[in-house]
From Swiss-Prot:
SUPFAM superfamilies: Ribosomal protein S19. The gene is rps19. It comes from Psilotum nudum. Protein S19 forms a complex with S13 that binds strongly to the 16S ribosomal RNA. It is found in: Plastid, Chloroplast. One of its GO terms (cellular component) is mitochondrial small ribosomal subunit. One of its GO terms (biological process) is translation. It holds the Pfam family Ribosomal_S19. InterPro entries: Ribosomal_uS19, Ribosomal_uS19_bac-type, Ribosomal_uS19_CS, Ribosomal_uS19_SF. GO terms for molecular function: rRNA binding; structural constituent of ribosome. HAMAP family: Ribosomal_uS19. Its main location: plastid. This is Small ribosomal subunit protein uS19c. PROSITE patterns: RIBOSOMAL_S19. Keywords: Chloroplast, Plastid, Ribonucleoprotein, Ribosomal protein, RNA-binding, rRNA-binding.
Amino acid sequence: MTRSLKKVPFVAHHLWKKIESLNIKKEKRVIITWSRASTIVPGMIGHTIAVYNGREHLPIYVTDRMVGHKLGEFVLTRTFRGHARKDKKSRR
């Protein structure tokens, strides 16, 4: 179910304060955050945000096509190692 149009998109307060201060200073710097649930808004375009995946912070460069999505959608938390092989050696 999508979020109601009456409500504003969720952006963590501490993250929004950092982005606003960088926009005022016209500065580009990597912003480190743990807030995977924050929605990408137009004020974030052009910034690099390092999002935590459970082990490390992975940098994401925000483009205009990402607006409306969550930060966590672009950083995977699980690594896929491949399916089990189908031969007799691997079953032993």
